[in-house]
Regions:
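A short, charged helix-loop
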Residues: 173-189
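Short, low-complexity, polar/charged sequence segments that are solvent-exposed and flexible
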Residues: 139-140, 148-150, 169, 178-180, ...
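Extended, low-charge, aliphatic-rich alpha-helical segments
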Residues: 4-7, 22-127, 185-497
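Hydrophobic h-region of N-terminal signal peptides that target proteins for export
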Residues: 16-22
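Sec-dependent N-terminal signal peptides
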Residues: 7-15
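Solvent-exposed loop/turn segments at secondary-structure junctions
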Residues: 157, 179-182, 494
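Eukaryotic helix-linker segments that join adjacent hydrophobic helices
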Residues: 86-156, 160-177
């Protein structure tokens, strides 16, 4: 039996089984996974910045979760249509049908290359009770009635799901058919009654097949849909930034996994110009050992920085109000450290004043993934003294080239970063008090440690959001850094749906 189901669109870049996924890990290093069988990815679009792979293990786990949902729905199934059939002068009526006992369904998935997924459900045994009544009219009338208990020794449901990309970057899923195999044994107590029952048995099988298919496909169309609709294609964060997770290509299926390919780009909200550069190709993923893999391009970070840079969000003023201990004072407190002690000439010429530091970028900060995560920050440090008499004195200007090595952390559906070490170079661009060869390293090092690094880490602590579902615990997790590619591999356990 095949039931044709309508096509429905889903406004998200993830397949329905991804509703069982939530990333929650705090590890930053792990051993690389090695496999002997290479699994090529399909990446035809140069805009891909984010790839998700759900493996056969992940689909099997999700298929069993769906089977558990079916089990709960069958427990509360309280209506099966009555059956009335008339054949060869015999009218058979079956009423008050009810499922009185059944074994928990077992679910697993079968990936169909270049097509989609088949959700297979197996119910080992089911018992259905009801009342029967038959009447035959010829040159005499004979009728009888009674109760019965029918046994389904094994029931198999095969639900085929076709998956493609919608016009707006979400997913379109079509439940193309539900095939069911039912082995029904119906015993009314005597050979004569069983002959009569055999007339109704095919019709009863059809009713049960239809009911089971309706419930199972409803899990996809209603339960999965309600969760998927909460997973957006675009996420606005920090009020002004938008992460675009729209799907760029149809999902790619092999027997071992499904991959989806996404934009993975951060832009300024309502900015029509977009990002003027594209992501570099991601390293082909060969692993299939975990249930889920996420590949994140360094383009995600670079587009985020460009959006901030192009809207002047990376320029800022630093005064004593921003730093501890009055470090920018030209006259130090007793026993304290300040710029007047680091550079005595400033303290002598401008006593009891406070320096204002302007920090701005020449270029957008640049992230590079290549075995490690590195951030390159090029900017200008401009030191001024706003005198109490109202005059503003420009002291010196330093060009800064900062290279910072970062750690990456994925926790609570966000990708976080933090500087773990850094190096920098300076160029003396403007200096009214000191010679060209003056060493500004101690001062620059102080400013970087006390303000620039904390400022960058503050942004890293905000994190970049990932489209995931809460309520899941991940296990057996690894985070791997390769050229332009950050790869997260994990298994997961669902505590509740």
């Amino acid at each position: 039996m095949s039931n044709k189901i309508q096509v429905f669109a889903i406004p998200t870049g993830l397949l329905f089984l991804s509703l069982f996924i939530f990333v929650k890990t705090q590890t930053t290093t792990a051993e690389d996974i090695v496999t002997n069988k290479e699994q090529p990815s399909v990446q035809n679009n140069s805009d891909i910045g984010f790839i998700m792979r759900i493996t056969a293990q992940g689909f099997d786990y999700g298929a069993q979760l769906g089977a558990d949902v079916l089990y709960q729905k069958l427990k509360h199934m309280n209506y099966i249509p009555d059956l009335i059939t008339k054949q060869n002068g015999v009218e058979m009526t079956i009423t008050n049908l009810s499922i009185v006992d059944f074994s928990p369904p077992v679910g697993y998935a079968e990936l169909i290359p270049d097509h989609g997924v088949r959700w297979i459900l197996s119910i080992n045994h089911t018992k259905v009770s009801g009342y029967w009544n038959y009447i035959t009219r010829a040159w005499f009338t004979f009728q009888d009635e009674g109760s019965f208990l029918a046994v389904l020794h094994e029931t198999i449901l095969n639900i085929t799901i076709e998956i493609t990309r919608s016009s707006y970057g979400g997913v379109v899923m079509t439940v193309s058919e539900c095939e069911s195999i039912i082995n029904l044994e119906m015993n009314l107590g005597s050979w004569l009654y069983n002959i009569v029952a055999s007339l109704a048995q095919p019709f009863l099988e059809n009713i049960l097949q239809s009911q089971l298919c309706d419930i199972a496909t409803g899990i996809i169309k209603v339960d999965a849909m309600s969760i998927l609709e909460k997973l957006p294609v675009n996420i606005t964060f920090q009020n002004n930034y938008v992460m675009d997770y729209s799907m760029l290509e149809p999902p790619y299926f092999t027997e071992d996994y499904m991959e989806t390919y996404h934009k993975g780009e951060v832009t300024w909200k309502d900015d029509k110009e977009g990002i003027p550069f594209k992501p570099m190709p991601l390293i082909p993923l060969i692993e299939t050992d975990r249930m889920l893999y996420l590949q994140i391009s360094d383009h995600v970070f670079n587009s985020y920085c460009y959006a901030a840079f192009s809207h002047n969000m990376l320029s800022f003023e630093v005064t004593n109000d921003n730093l501890p201990g009055n470090i920018l004072s030209t006259t130090c407190e007793s026993g304290g450290l300040c710029i007047g002690r680091l550079l005595p000439k400033i303290g002598e010429q401008f006593p009891n004043e406070s320096i204002s530091l302007s920090v701005f970028n020449n270029l957008s900060p640049h992230w590079t993934f290549d075995d490690t995560i590195q951030l390159n920050f090029k900017g200008i440090l401009n030191f001024n003294i706003p005198l109490k008499n109202g005059r503003n004195v420009s002291i010196f200007m330093i060009e800064l080239d900062l290279k910072a090595h970062m750690s990456a952390v994925i926790k609570d559906s966000r990708l976080y970063s933090q500087i773990v070490k850094f190096t920098f170079k300076t160029i003396n661009r403007k200096n009214s008090l000191y010679g060209e060869n003056f060493n500004f390293y101690p001062l620059t090092n102080l400013v970087i440690k006390k303000y620039v690094i904390p400022r960058i880490n503050d942004q890293g602590r905000i994190g970049i959001p990932l489209v995931m579902m809460s309520g899941t615990m991940v296990v057996n997790t690894e985070l791997k850094i390769q050229k332009h590619t950050l790869t997260l591999g994990t298994d997961f356990e669902i505590k509740h749906l």
